[in-house]
Amino acid sequence: MYSSSVVSNPNERLVNNRVENDLESSDDTLSTQAKPVSRLLTRKLLLGVVVLFFLAGVSVVSYFLFSKYKMLNKFKRELDDHLTKDFPNLERSKRDTCFDELTRLFGDGFLSDDPKLEYEVYREFEEFNSKYNRRHATQQERLNRLVTFRSNYLEVKEQKGDEPYVKGINRFSDLTEREFYKLFPVMKPPKATYSNGYYLLSHMANKTYLKNLKKALNTDEDVDLAKLTGENLDWRRSSSVTSVKDQSNCGGCWAFSTVGSVEGYYMSHFDKSYELSVQELLDCDSFSNGCQGGLLESAYEYVRKYGLVSAKDLPFVDKARRCSVPKAKKVSVPSYHVFKGKEVMTRSLTSSPCSVYLSVSPELAKYKSGVFTGECGKSLNHAVVLVGEGYDEVTKKRYWVVQNSWGTDWGENGYMRLERTNMGTDKCGVLDTSMSAFEL
């Protein structure tokens, strides 16, 4: 017996099946129609989001451009007022050039919104160009130099006095770090040469040397050469150091250091004052490369073998030329030695002003006065003359006295006091290698 809910009539079953099929077909149709609608809504939503982001971006850019426009106009107005009020006699052409260059750099984002400060930097830059005879090939090069100079000038201006040395503006102030190191390629120092203590003591035992040594040590007492260390010795006290020289744009520090040391040797040992020709070394030392760099060892060997004429007979011309030496009196050295480490102080410096290598850096190049404790270069790349050692009462630091060849407007009238660290080859590698002239 079947349930009453079961349809037994075939016709009725057929009708029911058709109804069910129609309902399923209707559902499929609705589903098919809903999909395009859903896609359309999704696309409209995405388009709306894109439009909103675009409008937001346009608004931000517009706001930025408008703000930049307002700031530029404000800078122009304040700069114009500053020039008109505080510099009424400024030539019109110079005023226009200054105004155009500063507003251009401000618009490019290189300057602050303080026109008084920026014009101060600008005036210092103009004085710098005049002092060091700078010429710029294009306006873009000039503006690039101004931006670099500005960075160095503000670093000097904003010193807080926390360091025991003072920075200053000098010939390197418009150079980038990369350009600076290009001027000072790595130098390879020679190996030490053997010399026993008795040999060194015997050559120093002459009256002229002992007289000058006592002056250099600032003492009237007799000096025990066997215990001589080099501390508190300054060859400038005995007038055993010749004048500061200027290598200008020539990378000939190796020649200047050699000549300065040889001149110091004759002053300290024989009271003979010479101004020898750096140019002869630049022109004629075939193992070096003139103003592109050279070797101290090669320079000393040239002086030993051939000697040097005076600077008056063959003056420095800021470039290397074909070797042509006039017939004139020559000064040579009988011998020379290379020292390393502590012997740079105890044997080389105690004998006379000596040539040493340094690892110089852009920070060191900014030095103006005080005891330099700043960052050195990573490799030996410069040669100078070591003339003494001392102690600074203010900073409570010991230091080395170095004569540079960057002119008297650099450092302390051409000299530098370099912190003595007593670590390794000491500050900036000053104790790495030295060379000194000696008697046979």
UniProtKB/Swiss-Prot annotation:
Involved in processing to yield active enzymes: region residues: 166-182
Transmembrane domains' residue ranges: none
Residues linked to a glycan? N206
Q: Name one GO molecular function term.
A: cysteine-type peptidase activity
Task: Name the SUPFAM superfamilies on file.
Answer: Cysteine proteinases
Which one Pfam family would you cite for this protein?
A: Peptidase_C1
Which pairs of Cys residues are joined through disulfide bonds in the record?
C250-C291
**What are the record keywords, sorted?**
Disulfide bond, Glycoprotein, Hydrolase, Protease, Signal, Thiol protease, Zymogen
Give the signal peptide range: 1-60
* Its EC number(s): 3.4.22.-
Which of the seven top EC classes does this enzyme belong to? hydrolase
Check the record and name the InterPro entries matching this protein: Papain-like_cys_pep_sf (IPR038765), Pept_asp_AS (IPR025661), Pept_cys_AS (IPR000169), Pept_his_AS (IPR025660), Peptidase_C1A (IPR013128), Peptidase_C1A_C (IPR000668), Peptidase_C1A_papain-like (IPR039417), Prot_inhib_I29 (IPR013201)
SMART domains this protein is in?
Inhibitor_I29, Pept_C1
Specify the propeptide location in this chain: 61-229
- This protein's source sits in the domain of life called Eukaryota
Q: Which residues form the active site?
A: C253, H382, N404
An example Gene Ontology biological process: proteolysis
Family to which this protein belongs: Belongs to the peptidase C1 family.
Name of the protein: Cysteine proteinase
